[in-house]
From Swiss-Prot:
The lineage of its organism: Eukaryota, Metazoa, Chordata, Craniata, Vertebrata. Signal peptide: none annotated. Its main location: nucleus. It comes from Xenopus laevis. This is Condensin-2 complex subunit G2. GO terms for cellular component: condensin complex; nucleus. The gene is ncapg2.
Length: 1156
């Protein structure tokens, strides 16, 4: 039996297994059986017989297992009945798959003589069941889709329905996450089938949803075939265009900006192929809508740049047929109106589009009308440059530069000159806006890209040279960027635009962003890396002579533009130059070492013969020119600093560089005695190990020892830095400790001196200088780190020595002739402050070891309570000097404690003790000078306490908060009492406490939810102070003419003015303050005509706005209700003060509550 006959018999209903075996053989690439070849061999009658059998096989399989049972195939079940049913369904799926493959293969053998009605029916059945197939049978869905595609492509009977089925399947597949590019290509291949769908029919609803999803699919938007397909969808129906545009607009914010060009391309393709109503709809409903939004969207809207991107794409297509005319027609009702709009942002947006689309013209206009249209648009450009809004003027500058750069040859010279004169003459010096000035220099590089503009700009730009000194940094940055552009395009010599002395003057003083750009501008001029090293040195000297400070700045950033190798070469070349200068001065002394001809370190420097330079430098430099010598040494320091990391990574090069400079450093110290030369030499020495410069390293400590007290910081700073870099900071501390110990009271000095062997030195001790050294070390981070890295024993010894100053301070508080010392008051106070500061640095360093050093500060607080405060509290008359000393000690201690609180080192125990000291200080009533610092401390403790309570509700802070409230209350009482007794001093005190008091109130207000008790207590204290003071001032009025209600806070008495100034800064504080005032009035805690009037004055000054806030009205209403109870006062004599106050208050209340 032949294969043909066997296959035909297998398609019978009783031979399903044989049929499936044939299908399996067909799918097996390695088997020679090919269904396509077999079908080619069949006669017309056999083909028809085969298709009949396939139809019968398919229908009987579907009848045996109808669609309703198919979903069970995906369900896992152990039920025997369901397992058997699932097995039957799987068999049916195999039959469907086999029939589909056979039907698809049959399409190749259909010709005009064959009747394929049966095959059509079979394909129709398959097409009908495709959507009911289980998800697990995706391979059958794919086979049916291929069948439908092939049917449609062959153009057989019923192709429209099969095409629609294939289209829907491909459309859904293309929207899947795992979609492949080929699916989108196939979808485009079937795009004509969309026209078979009736847009208004029910079946098209699902199609519409899927099609609209395509416009949100990145795969469709990015692929060429996808964009073709999407642009084709515009032609389906006019109403669908609006749906497409609405979908894109709604999702525009979610789409990345990078896709906007593709989105615009879709619109453009659709527009290009459209005609009639479709064209009109695309233009008016889509493109013109984008134009409208491009003009009216706020500039800060995330959609604005995306809409601009879409419109820019259309502007770029102006040379394409019909685009220019389309833009002219669509912009006509939008852009000209936008340019005249009242809203400056709308004008600016319209200007941006106008500039991009320029010229907006209809190519169909005649020559005369075209000229008029262009002239009108140039007039609009001039109008933009004269707009009152800086944003619009900036846009106008951008527009002029873009347009003139693009159309330079076509614009009349007179207009070009006028435009540039307007920009460079007026707007570059626009005093009202730095943004406009900045835009001028940012946009000029656009114009410089056109070489034709260079001659005119070369003549006009020198007038702008002083713009380099603009007070706005961004303008200066833009100006230098413009000079860089001029240099890059070779439009002119940049130093002719802006003279070199101006550029260097700016480099000397300007910020990093400007300086780095200037260095970039000047780099090739002063560091020509393509020339010999001697030339580099010559340029360096020339730069020094032009501007030494600018030279240092230049070489500070030079490393950014060249390799470390070149920097090192320049350092060594300068070294040779300095050596040559010294040799000419002292010809008999050879400052050169024998190693100068040796090889260099790997990759950094190369050896050069150390012979005297025979160059122009000999005629310029001399050791007598100390300024130039110092500048060269400073530049070596700057250069070395810039490549320290590179040298650290190349040990051989580092060693070579150190050896070169170490060999000549002693001669440099001999030759260059001036202080300005000595400083860089010391810094150079600090870059080397001390063993490399033994003579100098042994003399550093001696230099520090022999300095006079009161020496300037610059005399010892570099020496101390040097020792710190060498790890010898301990020597400085030993010297400082020695001087301090010798200056303290004699009994202590003798006791300490017995414990150590010391070289006899007849020099007197210098405690002030010792403190200068210690303070310098502690103030600078690098030095402080070196200090704290010492052994704990040495640090404790320093702390102990500094702590002995308390005995000196006690001597000033309670003078005694029995004790002598050599420390003045200022020095003692500095030592005390450094003692407290050092204890905190040590606590931070060794925090993991407990609170040892924090307890030191607590002990100091105990000393203040036991020794300092009793002196202030005593009723004995003490002189002004001890009292001032007590105040200064308190200030120094509280300042350090405030810093401890701020950096988070204070635990609850420390806070409690500090709060106790604060209360003690306030209760003395003689420490008003300390009140500003006390308020700062209260603020910090309050913030820590409330934050802790807020984060952990179980924390008990009530005692602490009560103490804070008590301290605050006492502080305000002290201020009020001071105002009554010594008003002039108190007024100065109010100025100093306003800032810390405001910070305290702000903290309490911000954390009011953490402690309502503290919040209310603070507000009631402030309120009582204000009401009492204003009432007191009203009570002192003797003449009715003096009764003037306050119109602002400045009209209030001093304390009230201070408090209300703080309150009105925060709307929430005003609201809380007035609520507290209203409650006090309601509870009759504020009563009487004068007190209620004082409360009214508070309400009046609390509102800055014309519209009276609800909180102010509530307070006014409460005052009105209580004040009415005193109406009998109107029966008093007309000259009565209380009556006048009452009537004045009622008038104010009537105006507030019943405005006309």
């Amino acid at each position: 039996m032949s294969k043909r006959e066997a296959f035909l018999q297998a398609t019978a209903k009783d031979s399903v297994e044989d049929f499936l075996s044939f299908i399996q053989l067909h799918k097996d690439v390695s088997d020679p059986f090919d269904l396509n070849e077999l079908l080619q061999e069949l006669s017309r009658k056999q083909k028809e017989e085969l298709w009949e059998k396939l139809k019968t096989l398919l229908t009987e399989a579907l009848v045996a297992n109808p669609v309703e049972r198919w979903q069970n195939i995906d369900d896992d079940s152990d039920d025997d009945m369901e397992v058997e049913s699932s097995s039957d369904v799987k068999q049916t799926m195999c039959v469907i798959h086999g029939v589909t493959i056979a039907a698809a293969a049959s399409l190749c053998v259909i010709d005009e003589d064959v009747c394929y009605e049966t095959l059509l029916e079979c394909a129709a059945i398959l097409s009908g069941i495709v959507h009911a197939l289980p998800k697990s049978e995706s391979h059958i869905t794919l086979a049916i889709r291929h069948l439908c595609e092939a049917w449609w492509e062959k153009g057989l009977q019923g192709k429209e329905e099969f095409g629609k089925t294939a289209f829907l399947l491909l459309l859904a597949k293309s929207l899947e996450v795992k979609c492949v590019v080929a699916d989108i290509g196939r979808l485009w291949h079937l795009h004509q089938t969309l026209l078979s769908f009736d847009f208004n029919s029910e079946e098209s609803h699902n199609v519409k949803d899927l099609l609209l999803q395509c416009f949100l699919s990145i795969n469709h938007i990015k692929k060429e075939e996808g964009r073709r397909f999407l642009s084709f969808l515009f032609s389906w129906d006019v109403n669908f265009i609006k749906m497409i545009h609405g979908t894109i607009k709604n999702q525009l914010q979610c789409l990345p900006k990078s896709l906007m060009t593709h989105i615009a391309d879709i619109y453009f393709r659709a527009w290009k192929k459209a005609s009639g109503d479709v064209l009109q709809t695309i233009e008016q409903s889509c493109i013109q809508d984008f134009m409208h939004h491009g003009v009216h969207l706020p500039r800060n809207s995330p959609l604005h740049p995306k809409v601009r991107e879409v419109l820019s794409y259309f502007h770029q297509q102006k040379l394409r047929q019909g685009v220019e005319e389309m833009l002219y027609n669509l912009y006509q009702p939008i852009i000209w109106r936008g340019l005249k709009a009242r809203n400056s942002e709308v004008r600016s947006n319209a200007a941006l589009l106008f500039v991009e689309a320029f010229p907006i013209r209809d190519p169909n206009l005649n020559h005369e009308d075209m000229d008029n249209e262009i002239q009108k648009q140039f007039e609009e450009l001039f109008n933009l440059l004269e707009d009152p809004q800086p944003l619009v003027r900036s846009t106008g500058v951008l527009g002029v530069c873009k347009i003139t750069a693009k159309y330079w040859e076509m614009i009349p010279p007179a207009i070009l000159t006028d435009l540039l004169r307007k920009i460079l003459g007026d707007l570059a010096a626009d005093v009202s806006s730095a943004d406009v000035r900045c835009s001028v220099f940012k946009c000029l590089p656009i114009l410089l890209d056109n070489k034709l503009s260079h001659p005119l700009l070369e003549n006009m730009l020198p007038a702008l040279k002083f713009c380099l000194h603009d007070n706005s940094e961004k303008v200066r940055v833009a100006f230098v960027d413009m000079l860089l552009k001029i240099k890059a395009v070779r439009a002119a010599k940049f130093w002719k635009i802006c003279p070199m002395e101006q550029i260097l003057a700016r480099l000397e003083v300007d910020s990093r962003p400007v300086s780095r750009r200037i260095v970039n501008l000047l780099f090739n001029s002063f560091f020509p890396v393509n020339q010999q090293e001697e030339v580099w040195c010559e340029r360096c000297v020339a730069l020094i002579q032009m501007n030494p400070a600018a030279a240092r700045k230049f070489y500070q950033y030079a490393y950014e533009h060249t390799a470390p190798t070149n920097i090192a070469k320049l350092m060594l070349t300068i070294r040779r130059c300095l050596n040559a200068c010294i040799n000419r001065t002292v010809p008999n002394e050879d400052t050169e070492d024998e190693d100068d001809d040796e090889g260099d370190g790997e990759g950094i420097v190369r050896g050069d013969s150390e012979k005297e330079n025979k160059s122009v430098l000999e005629n310029v430099l001399s050791t007598e020119d100390s300024a130039s010598m110092a500048s060269l040494l400073e530049i070596v320091v700057v250069l070395w600093r810039s490549i320290r990391k590179a040298l650290d990574q190349n040990e051989e090069a580092k060693t070579y560089t150190i050896s070169k400079f170490a060999s000549v450093l002693p001669e440099y110290f001999k030759a260059f005695k001036e202080e300005r030369c000595t400083v860089p030499l010391i810094i150079l020495a600090s870059f080397m190990p001390p063993a490399a410069v033994p003579t100098f390293s042994c003399s550093v400590l001696s230099k520090l020892r022999h300095l006079d007290s009161g020496a300037d910081e610059q005399k010892y700073s570099t020496l101390i830095d040097c020792l710190c870099r060498w790890g010898q900071v301990g020597h400085v501390l030993e010297l400082a400790s020695e001087w301090l110990s010798e200056s303290y009271p004699e009994k202590r000095g003798r006791k300490d001196s017995n414990r150590q062997v010391r070289i006899q030195d007849t020099m007197e001790s210098k405690p002030a200088l010792a403190l200068d050294y210690i303070e310098y070390i502690m103030t600078h981070t690098m030095n402080r780190d070196c200090l704290l890295s010492l052994q704990t024993k040495k640090l404790n010894q320093l702390l102990k020595v500094l702590g002995l100053v308390k005995e000196v301070l006690f001597c000033y508080i309670k003078p005694s002739e029995a004790v002598t010392h050599n420390v003045n008051q200022d020095t003692a106070l500095r030592a005390f402050s450094l003692y407290c500061r050092l204890s905190i640095h040590l606590q931070h360093k060794f925090s993991s070891e407990g609170r040892t050093y924090l307890s030191v500060l607590e002990d100091t607080g105990g000393w203040i309570e036991s020794q300092v405060l009793p002196t202030l509290e005593s009723n004995q008359d003490i002189s002004e000097e001890p009292r001032n000393m007590c105040h200064q000690i308190l200030k120094a201690y509280l300042t350090v404690c405030k810093d401890v609180l701020m950096v988070g080192l204070a635990d609850s125990e420390f806070q409690a003790q500090l709060l106790q000291i604060t209360l003690s200080v306030i209760q003395t009533e003689k420490c008003h000078n300390c009140l500003p610092m006390l308020f700062y401390v209260l603020k910090e403790i309050t913030e820590l306490c409330l934050a802790h309570k807020m984060s952990d509700a179980s924390v008990e802070c009530d005692e602490m908060l009560d103490a804070i409230q008590k301290a605050f209350h006492k502080s305000l009482e002290t201020v009020a009492r001071r105002l009554r007794k010594q008003r002039e001093e108190a007024l100065q005190l109010l100025q100093t406490i306003q800032l810390p008091l405001g910070e305290f109130v702000h903290t309490v207000q911000c954390w009011h939810t953490a402690s309502k008790v503290l919040h209310r207590g603070t507000l009631s204290t402030l309120l009582a102070a204000v009401v009492v003071e204003i009432s007191h001032s009203l009570r002192k009025i003797t003449d009715l003419s003096e009764l003037t209600p306050p119109s602002s806070i400045s009209d209030l008495p001093p304390l009230s003015k201070c408090i209300m100034t703080i309150i009105v800064k925060s709307p929430s504080a005003v609201s809380s303050f007035l609520d507290e005032l209203t409650e006090c009035i309601t509870l009759e805690e504020v009563e009487g005509i004068l007190s209620l009037t004082a409360a009214l004055y508070v309400a009046v000054v609390s509102s800055k706005r014309k519209q009276i806030p609800p909180a102010v009205k509530n307070t006014a209403s409460a005052i009105y209700r209580k004040l009415k109870n005193f109406c009998e006062v109107t029966m008093d004599d007309a000259g009565s003060i209380e009556r006048a106050v009452y009537e004045s208050s009622m008038r104010i209340l009537n105006e507030m509550l019943h405005p006309s």
